[in-house]
């Protein structure tokens, strides 16, 4: 079997040296991806296309599908490559190939020709089109908007009978641009923005700020691995996980409510910039869209950018949520994003939309930056190829209950402000307050002879924190969902 890879048009308008470099990189990327399907296949580059020849017919569909997801490819032609002698021979071969497709349909013939011949492309179109029209009684020629277009390519003494055309994702080959670090949360925005930078030729590494224990990290790892495996597996990339719970705890305890959102983002950018510098990455990528939430106004984005010299790319800055969700659906991350948890109490109740630099800096003076340095130093860096095996590890399930026994205590893990606004009172059982960001250090001080029923309003944080505690060896925890 043979595939002809057509280049993304922006590649073809580059200078000769740049075009050759892009084609060489794309050829290598194709080899890296397809070697998993057929180690004997051949990838041959030409000035205006790349040929892929494979012997294992059983892998035809898998190879074709993989090619449609490699950045830099405009479209793929699945072809049958045969010799020919003259125009009548071309017609006879086209009749055998296309007869069934043309029964009862309107059609036209389009020919591309390279080499020296005693006929032109139009001559072939007329001869083959007329012959097909005569020999297939139910078919009818229609030059504009036909139901079927018969594509033929003539190159020297070879005829390419095009059996199918399949659209690629376009863009530039990965590796033609420099590396970037995507701040990935597993939601709609960060997944789409990561894809857009891969499509533009960047090798995308991932940085995840963990606010909810191992279960949340596993979910985000799965999203990152999916994106890499589907669109970027030609290159090795890093997945860096930073435990940001201590940072969030410090913010919630010391920072004024209205400034929390902007300061949290500034801390994330500081941390990600340190990671980027460590690994020689040139830019950060975020999924922020202008005005989508309070921290994404122009004033706040400028203040967030000011904490680092590292370039921050925001490919979704002018996109609305509906457009982003549609893109997530197209690339296959929608289902991941819909089930990814959102945390209760992490963001302030009345965030500022126009933060003042002096106020932000004054609030940050209360922050212990050694905490930020420590979590960055302890960041977990893994090769994304290892994630598939790691995420198959068993995640201990935590029992969810809607009632309680005599030895049970409800543990309200909401933030202090939420607890003050809506105190939890349940008749017949004790309620103890311990904000989620203190669980990792304070839960061990509680009476371990009691069973603790973790509770928050949405039930997401309570489940993830219960999973985290189970992983730490505490088996006396359940999730309370009345």
From Swiss-Prot:
Pathway(s) where this gene product acts: Cofactor biosynthesis; thiamine diphosphate biosynthesis
Enzyme nomenclature, EC number: 2.8.1.4
Reactions catalysed according to its record: [ThiI sulfur-carrier protein]-S-sulfanyl-L-cysteine + a uridine in tRNA + 2 reduced [2Fe-2S]-[ferredoxin] + ATP + H(+) = [ThiI sulfur-carrier protein]-L-cysteine + a 4-thiouridine in tRNA + 2 oxidized [2Fe-2S]-[ferredoxin] + AMP + diphosphate; [ThiS sulfur-carrier protein]-C-terminal Gly-Gly-AMP + S-sulfanyl-L-cysteinyl-[cysteine desulfurase] + AH2 = [ThiS sulfur-carrier protein]-C-terminal-Gly-aminoethanethioate + L-cysteinyl-[cysteine desulfurase] + A + AMP + 2 H(+)
Pfam families in UniProt: ThiI, ThiI_fer, THUMP
GO molecular function: ATP binding; CCA tRNA nucleotidyltransferase activity; tRNA binding; tRNA-uracil-4 sulfurtransferase activity
Subcellular location: Cytoplasm
Single GO biological process annotation from the record: tRNA 4-thiouridine biosynthesis
Gene3D superfamilies per UniProt: 3.30.2130.30, HUPs (3.40.50.620), Rhodanese-like domain (3.40.250.10)
Active site: 456
Record SMART domains: THUMP (SM00981)
Record-stated family: Belongs to the ThiI family.
Name used for this protein in its record: tRNA sulfurtransferase
Organism (species): Escherichia coli O9:H4 (strain HS)
Higher taxonomy: Bacteria, Pseudomonadati, Pseudomonadota, Gammaproteobacteria, Enterobacterales
